[in-house]
């Protein structure tokens, strides 16, 4: 059984229609869809934590969602983005999970082991979703999230017409089938004393703090790509003499300018320089280039996986 949980409260919105596309994708299987707009679920409160002793006193049917998920072959969450966070229905769902699992670690582990994918209707790609969704998968997993930006398909997010675009629907089918265009990129983590070379670039029309990185060309090594991309994006010259080492790669999923689903593997390489060059932004998408104090970077960076990566890089640069 495939379970779809639509957290939107809109009856005819994009999330509802995306759920219909998911059902069509799995037409050879049994699909169970839970629409939050069809029920009124109660948030936690006005109780004495009975769920930690015996059982939750609320009986509004929300446990049926959890029961279906733990019996499913795969579960897909469909969520709207409200102010760069999942909507309140999702957090209500999180809260009420205590009443279902009731301290049963085996049941919780079974839930976490169920294959899950997440579709977010959003005009941004916020790390807040990764942080919120990580509680629904195992610790060693990365949440597989598809962000669908209505603007990319010339649609108004409020009209619920996103699925009228054939390319948008096709991307959902590709996502559910894990049909990605694979790309590889090299990232240059460049340290100068207690500072790190950073870029600010436009991502979904928002300035985003990042690090120099780019596509590995055919026949090019990861090291050569990192050195080249660093110069092309920031005008900073680094060489193999500045190279310290490499840390574990990570993956990101996104929709490219041709409206194709891409899985990009990024290889972070560490460099250390003794004297910085004259920095300049050399690509239109890059707004600013500068060396930031590492502590300031960690405070301003919105991606937890990048923060962890930088901490690891710092331990290797010495």
Feature map (PLM): residue ranges:
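N-terminal beta1-alpha1-beta2 submodule of the flavodoxin-like/Rossmannoid cofactor-binding fold
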Residues: 1-102, 141-144, 162-175
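Short hydrophobic segments within beta-strands
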Residues: 5-7, 119-122, 199
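Short, well-ordered beta-strand core segments
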Residues: 74-75, 116-118
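Short, conserved loop/helix-junction motifs that constitute active-site signature segments
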Residues: 107-115, 137-140
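Glycine-rich phosphate/pyrophosphate-binding loop and the adjoining helix
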Residues: 128-179
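Charged phosphate-binding loop/patch that engages nucleotide di/tri-phosphates or the phosphate backbone
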Residues: 171-178, 299-318
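N-terminal strand-loop-strand
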Residues: 177-211
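Unchanged
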Residues: 216-240, 247-308
